[in-house]
């Protein structure tokens, strides 16, 4: 199925979770990362149980800290 992830169209297996998507993208779950699914925040504890669907839009946001 096709989804949008951080502005890129991707083909992922049906039934993929956010956790699986992050693995496909080579992303490591970190404290300074936020994942949105269709503009809704997904809590880190829900990555393994949140399933993406055809045409979903996922944004992976890395927070920047510093002064």
Predicted regions and their residues:
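Ubiquitin-like/PB1-type beta-grasp interaction modules and other compact soluble beta-rich domains
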Residues: 1-66
């Amino acid at each position: 199925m096709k989804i949008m992830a951080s502005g890129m169209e991707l083909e992922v297996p049906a039934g993929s979770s956010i956790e699986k998507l992050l693995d496909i993208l080579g992303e490591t779950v970190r404290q300074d990362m936020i994942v949105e699914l269709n503009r809704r925040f997904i809590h880190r504890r829900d990555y393994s149980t949140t399933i993406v669907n055809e045409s979903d839009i996922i944004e992976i946001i890395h927070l920047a800290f510093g002064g």
